[in-house]
């Protein structure tokens, strides 16, 4: 299957969902600067993109550059309830948002995760 995303991602769009994967990412350090990844077990890539998007919008390169395999027992295979907890933790602890905002962003992320599956995943 091939997973794509929106062609242009703004700060608002990035808080909706982490559209960017870290497998094949390039960013211009002269524009964005040095970005340190948050020291959290899960979603550290998302935490990084939330920092990047503060300085520049993101754009989709509409090419398949890599393959990604998920194996049994990997951190990427967590249960859905566990993923919800990690998203909440990201918004609450890393982004330092109030509880209600962290809950809202977590729920918003779930909704856009479903939209991504319906609209941006294609079986090849």
Question: Regions from the language model: what does each represent?
Answer:
Residues 1-82:
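Conserved nucleotide-sugar donor-binding catalytic segment
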Residues 59, 65, 73, 77-124:
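Non-catalytic, C-terminal membrane-associated alpha-helical segments of glycosyltransferases
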């Amino acid at each position: 299957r091939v997973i794509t995303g929106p062609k242009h991602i703004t700060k608002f769009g990035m808080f909706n969902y982490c559209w960017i994967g870290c497998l094949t990412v390039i960013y211009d350090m002269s524009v964005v600067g040095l970005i340190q990844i948050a020291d959290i077990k899960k979603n550290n890539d998302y935490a990084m993109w939330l920092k990047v998007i503060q300085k520049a919008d993101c754009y989709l390169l509409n090419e398949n550059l890599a393959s990604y395999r998920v194996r049994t027992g990997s951190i990427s295979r967590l249960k859905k309830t566990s993923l919800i907890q990690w998203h909440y933790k990201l918004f609450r602890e890393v982004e330092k948002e109030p509880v209600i905002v962290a809950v809202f962003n977590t729920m918003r992320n779930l909704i856009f995760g479903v939209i991504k599956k319906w609209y941006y995943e294609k079986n090849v």
